[in-house]
Structures are given as structure tokens and as C-alpha cells.
């Protein structure tokens, strides 16, 4: 056979196969685009494990019609302009391949609008060909809907796993983003049902505790700078392990990466028995000029300019912080089961630290209390314990779309609406909620058997912010704490930990 140039359509299909392996990679590329578009709310919807559909909607900056048409062409990007830019990449995408590859091997719909546009642009695409361009309505942002992945590559289509396995891979891919971007609201639905809903959190560690529940049994957090690197992490104590590497997450400059080198460092420091693995979420920040992210189209493999420096710094950081094992394993044990008020405790001196924490001297050591977490739990329990909730009128114009059944369920808990179903105006809300909290609550809520708990959870946003507690509020909360013996806030974070005098003596080698 003579050598000849391949048709452009075939070249594009081959390139698409290198970037898009299964529905989870569609999800990955679309979420990365949303994050690069400065979205702070991203909704991922999949059907049949993503084999039928993957849809990602965001509230980012959107695209004009011209930009949308350009975005589906290969090697078009807004992230880099020159070869030099490859050495200082800060965005998730940069190759200009993802969207073009996706639309080559699927039936896709793109709806996008910028803040300046009066109407949104809608593109209908099949196998890389634009079949329809029209205008429609939507808020600023972008929705990309991908259906029938690999419909024009039957062998690849047939090689997809079962719907259950593809769903698991999509969820795992989704969680990689949720862990690193605590500044973004994430929602994940499968076949019309909400599977995950993660509101923004104060820090990355809170997100990790929400997703990786086994971390709560014992963990260590740290944040350090050394040798020009910034290393931050939340890792399990040596007693908390898994039988596989599923709890291992490495991020370099905010990008999830797979790295055997970093894995080896982690395993070396933990020195666990065979087939035991720690749970670890590690974030490494390096100078972009000392990092090559252009190793593979998937962008999950990176190469460090000075790999030994990175490995040594990570090893030192992990060793230093895991040496505090005695502290954390003691720190997150359950507090004494005796119900004491602060005044009744044998030793009740306490003081406030930075408006965030209370340090209480108890009989056998020091008790540290996170006042914000305690206040959240106090509000949550108080609301749940009420048999009926009072109402107050809403001053703003808040509209929500509800079915008749959803409306009736919400009315049982203090809401009232104008209208019977469909787009309803909120007239009254439970007395303990603010209008800001209600607007956020209605952005994403399932009306289910846990509705009362969800409303109470929304009310937790009314807790005094960390750093703003005074001694009067702290004293009242400590009384509640010693009477109720709360262990965790409604989100699962620990409220307190105790250091015994015996452990202090051991640490100082007395």
C-alpha cells in the first residue's frame, strides 16, 4: 500500500480517540472548560452511566456565537497564544482539542450566552458537523450536552463498560474536581436523581471530610512552604487505611495528576503492611515554569523540572506531620461521656482564641472547641426539635418552580407560595431563615424524606462566622456543649478535641 495523506475527518476521529476514552473523560473536559470560564456553580447530569448523555451546565462567562463556532474546531483556544505560554500554564485546558474531539464522536448541543448578549446561541452538532444554529434563552453561562458517545465509532461504542461501571468512573472523575475547588458549588445527577450536591465550603479540608468519610476516623492537616514549593494536605492517620489506592489524590497547581513518583513517596513515609493504603489528598504548588503539563492529551500526567526536589520536600513534609500522630489520634477521640457544665467542671478556666476557638481546662487535660462548628450544630438541633415553625413574610421577589406535591411538602415546614404549581412566588418562609439563605436553598434542593433536615442544615449558615465570637456567646455555647456532648457539626466536621496531660508529658519526653 502506498503512503498517502489521511482525510481530515479521519484524522479528527483518531485525535478524538486519544483524548476521549469514555464518558468520564467527556465529563472531565467539560468541567475543566467550565472552571476555566470562571464558573462558581457547575451541574453535571448523566444518563445510563453517561453512555446516553453527559450534560454540563455552568454560570461562567459564556461564549459569543463566533467563539462557540470556533471552539468546536481543533486547536482553537483562549488559554495560550505562543510557545512561551506553555511554560506558564495556569488554566485546566490549553491544547484546544477537547470540545472539538467530543463533538467529532457524538451528537452534541451547545447553548451559551455572554453577559452582553441579549439571547443565547444554540448549536446542534453531529459527528463534528454543525447541523443547526439558532437563538434561545438562558442566563449567562454555557451548557454542553453530549449524547450517543462514539455513535460513529461502533467498536469504541461497544467497548464501553456497563452502565454501573461507567457511572462509577464518572462519579470518581467528578469528585476529583469537587475536592480541589471548594469555591464552586457542584451538583451531580444520574438518570434524573441528585446523587451529590456540594455547596461551597470555607476550605479544601472541609470538602475532603464531606467526600472521604473514612478520613473522619483520624486525620492530619498541614500547609507548608519549603524549597520554593507550597504543600498542603489532609491525610489519614496510620490506623485509617484502604485496601486499594482509591483514596489517593494528588494535585499539582490545582490539576489532578496520576504520579507513581508521588505515590512511592507516600507509601515510603507511611510504611504500611502489604495491600494497605492511606487516604490522602495532597496539593503541591510549583512555579509553572518548572512543570511540563503537555505530556499527554489527557493532561493527567505531568513532569517536574526538578523531580527530586519535589519528592524530597513532600517526604519531609509528610514525615514531620505524621510524627504528630499521637496528637491527632488522641485529638479526635470522643470527649468524656460525663455531662458537665463549664461551671460544674472540676477545672473550668477557659479562654477565647482568635474569636474562633475556646480552650477549656478540664480535669485531665485541655479541651479545644471549634465555636463555629458548635454553633452550627446547636442551631441545627434546636430547629429539628421544634414541633412547628413560625413564619415571616418575604420582602424580595423570590420565584421557584415546584410541582403541586413539592409545594404541599414545603408548606408543612413554614413556607407559603402564590400559585398552585409551576413558577411560584415565595410569600412566607420559616421564621429562622433569612432571604439570602432561602435563595441559596432553592438553587438546589430535593424534596424528599429528609426535607426537614435539609432546611435545618440551610439554617446553619446563620451561625456566627469563625473569628467573630465574643466571650458572652462562647460561654453560652460551651454550656450547651457540656450538656449535649455534641461530637460533630451537621456537615461532619469534629467540634472538639482533647489533649491529656499524660500525652503532653509524653510529647515533651518527661
From Swiss-Prot:
Q: Which GO terms describe its molecular function?
A: ATP binding; ATP hydrolysis activity; ATP-dependent DNA damage sensor activity; mismatched DNA binding
Q: What InterPro entries is this protein classified in?
A: DNA_mismatch_repair_CS, DNA_mismatch_repair_MutL, DNA_mismatch_S5_2-like, HATPase_C_sf, MutL/Mlh/PMS, MutL/Mlh/Pms-like, MutL_C, MutL_C_dimsub
Keywords of this protein's UniProt record, alphabetized? DNA damage, DNA repair
Supply one GO CC term from the record.
mismatch repair complex
Q: Name one Pfam family in it.
A: DNA_mis_repair
Which BP terms in the Gene Ontology apply to this protein? mismatch repair
Q: Which NCBIfam families match?
A: mutl
What family, per the record? Answer: Belongs to the DNA mismatch repair MutL/HexB family.
What does this chain do? This protein is involved in the repair of mismatches in DNA. It is required for dam-dependent methyl-directed DNA mismatch repair. May act as a 'molecular matchmaker', a protein that promotes the formation of a stable complex between two or more DNA-binding proteins in an ATP-dependent manner without itself being part of a final effector complex.
Q: Record's HAMAP family?
A: DNA_mis_repair (MF_00149)
Protein known as: DNA mismatch repair protein MutL
> Which organism's genome codes for this protein?
Thermotoga maritima (strain ATCC 43589 / DSM 3109 / JCM 10099 / NBRC 100826 / MSB8)
